[in-house]
């Protein structure tokens, strides 16, 4: 007979924390300079006019304006900012 009670070990509890990726400012919405437009892994969306990409592939607005998503001839998605009229 066992002199110690058999203790099971859990096989749960390993799920990683979500990274909150995705589009943060959609097409037609306003953005100010420095705003995060898209958080992504890899370049799913590419930077267009007035948008820059950071080292983790996040797209940011370079100037204040309206966000525009478009696909070009190469069928890649590009994100641009159309500046507000001064």
Swiss-Prot record:
NCBIfam families: L27 (TIGR00062). SUPFAM superfamilies: Ribosomal L27 protein-like (SSF110324). GO terms for cellular component: cytosolic large ribosomal subunit. The lineage of its organism: Bacteria, Pseudomonadati, Bacteroidota, Flavobacteriia, Flavobacteriales. InterPro entries: Ribosomal_bL27, Ribosomal_bL27_CS. Signal peptide: none annotated. It comes from the Bacteria. Belongs to the bacterial ribosomal protein bL27 family. This is Large ribosomal subunit protein bL27. HAMAP family: Ribosomal_bL27. Keywords: Ribonucleoprotein, Ribosomal protein. GO terms for molecular function: structural constituent of ribosome. Coiled coil: none annotated. GO terms for biological process: translation.
């Amino acid at each position: 007979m066992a002199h110690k009670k058999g203790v099971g070990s859990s096989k749960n509890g390993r799920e990683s924390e979500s990274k909150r990726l995705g589009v943060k400012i959609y097409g037609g919405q306003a953005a100010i300079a420095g705003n995060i437009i898209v958080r992504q892994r890899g370049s799913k969306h590419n930077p267009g006019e007035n948008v820059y990409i950071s080292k983790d592939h996040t797209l940011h607005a370079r100037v204040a304006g309206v966000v525009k998503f478009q696909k070009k001839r190469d069928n890649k998605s590009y994100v641009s900012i159309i500046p507000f009229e001064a």
